[in-house]
Regions:
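CheY-like receiver
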Residues: 46-49, 84
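Structural micro-motif
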Residues: 48-59
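Non-catalytic, surface beta->alpha helical segment in thiol-disulfide oxidoreductase systems
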Residues: 59-91
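Nucleotide phosphate-binding site architecture
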Residues: 13, 53, 67
Length: 91
């Protein structure tokens, strides 16, 4: 099974855009986990393990191994999220 995390941080405008587009898609909660990339102003251990260097970053893991990453919000439209949810929603 693939776990999909959208890494975001507080005050990040591109993150807000990506989250807003994601939340327009029915069933997103069953597919994507919104994950805070920072704790107390520092990258979280999980974010570091996933290679996150900027937000928003999307990371897909299968059996704990990174299988895909995507950084930046420019392509994280509602159509992108809809396709992601449709592809991974019935696994």
């Amino acid at each position: 099974m693939t776990d999909i995390h959208l890494f975001v941080q507080e005050g990040c405008r591109p993150c807000m855009y990506a989250e807003t587009q994601l939340k327009k898609v029915e069933g997103w909660e069953n597919v994507v986990t919104i994950t805070n990339a920072k704790e107390n102003g520092e990258w979280s251990e999980f974010a570091k393990q996933c290679g996150v260097q900027a937000t928003p970053t999307l990371v897909a893991l299968t059996d704990g191994n990174i299988v895909a990453t995507k950084a930046g919000s420019q392509d994280m439209t509602s159509d992108f999220w809809r396709a992601t949810v449709e592809k991974h929603g019935n696994v």
